């Protein structure tokens, strides 16, 4: 099966024609069922609660304390490359991670403005810096829940997943060097991210770039 947030929308509904389904293998459905639509709504809600609502509450609670009790406060958020690059079989997960990324980067700009304001007993609040870590798949328990086809097995290259230790070391190096912003891992995915940004903003005469990105995504996720 697979975690609903890492399934195609129709897979969450239980009727993906390509055979990637949350609980069933119904490929012949021509319309959504009420149960399927309810599962989509519940999946979106759970994913947004975990990736957007939770971080927003934590940031709202901790930022005032960090601004007034630390001289060099910093926040590290573990996002995902799925929040930067659209991917088949990851629609809900990509959407919630993208929202999480924009939440963090927007709050970063807000903290930049707030750093100039006074605080009780202090001339000004400290500037809170942010590092957004956007790794590819990591070798942990979540990887085991990724989309699985009933006949072909996993839909992605799990053998290429990052080691937890590698992600931790890279993150600590950036924090120690006070290099904030976005850390994409592995590095070659930064190129894919840049190409995705160009794909969304550049009006080109042919569909060559879009076709290239689409082929790469379909090959990567085998969908």
Q: Where are the model-predicted features located?
A:
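A short helix-coil junction within the Rossmann-fold of NAD(P)-dependent oxidoreductases
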Residues: 5-8, 61-71
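Active-site Tyr-X3-Lys motif and surrounding loop/helix of classical short-chain dehydrogenase/reductase
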Residues: 8-49
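Active-site loop immediately N-terminal to the catalytic Tyr-X3-Lys motif
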Residues: 87-91
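SDR active-site lid
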Residues: 108-189
């Amino acid at each position: 099966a697979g975690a609903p947030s890492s399934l195609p929308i129709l897979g969450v509904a239980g009727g993906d024609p390509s055979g990637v389904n949350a609980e069933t293998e119904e490929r012949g459905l021509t319309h959504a069922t009420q149960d399927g639509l309810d599962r989509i709504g519940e999946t979106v809600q759970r994913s947004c609660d975990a990736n957007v609502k939770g971080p927003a509450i934590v940031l709202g609670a901790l930022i005032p304390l960090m601004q007034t009790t630390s001289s060099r406060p910093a926040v590290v958020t573990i996002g995902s490359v799925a929040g930067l690059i659209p991917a088949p079989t990851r629609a809900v997960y990509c959407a919630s991670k993208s929202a999480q990324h924009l939440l963090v980067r927007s709050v970063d700009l807000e903290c930049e403005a707030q750093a100039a304001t006074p605080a009780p007993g202090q001339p000004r609040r400290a500037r809170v810096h942010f590092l957004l870590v956007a790794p590819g798949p990591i070798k942990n328990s979540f990887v085991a829940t990724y989309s699985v086809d009933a006949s072909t097995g996993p839909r992605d290259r799990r053998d290429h997943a990052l080691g937890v230790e590698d992600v931790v070391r890279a993150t600590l190096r950036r924090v120690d060097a006070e290099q904030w912003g976005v850390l994409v891992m592995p590095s070659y995915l930064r190129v894919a991210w840049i190409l995705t940004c160009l794909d969304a903003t550049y009006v080109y005469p042919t569909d060559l770039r879009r076709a290239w990105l689409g082929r790469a995504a379909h090959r990567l996720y085998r969908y």
